[in-house]
Amino acid sequence: MNRDMRVVRECFIDDHVRGLFQQNRLRGFADLWHLDAPWVEAPNERRKGTSGVFRYPLEAGDGAIQPVFVKRQRNHNTKTCRHPIRGIPTFLREYRYIRELQQAGIPVVDAWYYGQAVSAGVQHAILVTRALEGYVSLDQWFALDENGNDEGQVRAVLRSVVDAVKPIHARGIGHGSLYGKHIFVRTGAGATPRARPSTSA
């Protein structure tokens, strides 16, 4: 992080998560910004900025691993009524949506951290979400051979996707990136399929 970068917003979901991050030598924005891991989604260039995602394993005190997705962006903004010229980071909007939906009891990914910093007029943002264990993306699910031919299972999974997305839209929140890679499904022998969308803004 540049010396002139100033952290303007930083939120951990709770003290337990803050402690888990500190256990992994991630004290805040600067440490998260400088993490080095292979990209799950290579940085894309849109909105006159960049945005990318990587998976990172956090070590818990009991030796267990809790993977998270670290999403980083630079000058990747969206305009709002309150900020019509410079806009706000799209991750800030996504973080707010996640919190709103969770408070309404709607299952979405868990946002564990949001941070924002400014350097020479350029906005930087980080959003960390807990990886959903036991879930795969809808794209991955359809790529599995055993899922392609069972019409009943396909219908059940698609119904779970509709059931997961419907309450989001009912709250007036439009999902800006509703693709198979952003919808996570959990299925298993005899289990009712469940879907959880990410909330990419």
Task: Please name every model-derived segment.
Residues 1, 69-75, 140-146:
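Short N-terminal helix-initiation segments at or just after the protein's N-terminus
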Residues 29-136, 166, 170:
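Conserved ATP-binding subdomain of kinase catalytic cores across diverse folds
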Residues 56-60, 142-144, 185-188:
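Short regulatory "switch" loops immediately downstream of catalytic or recognition motifs
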Residues 64-68, 89, 151-155, 192-199:
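Glycine-rich, flexible loop segments associated with nucleotide phosphate handling
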Residues 76-80, 144-148, 199-201:
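Short glycine/proline- and charge-enriched loop/turn segments
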Residues 97-107, 135, 141-176, 180-181:
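Conserved kinase catalytic-core helix
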Residues 177, 181-201:
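Catalytic activation segment of kinase domains across protein kinase-like and atypical kinase folds
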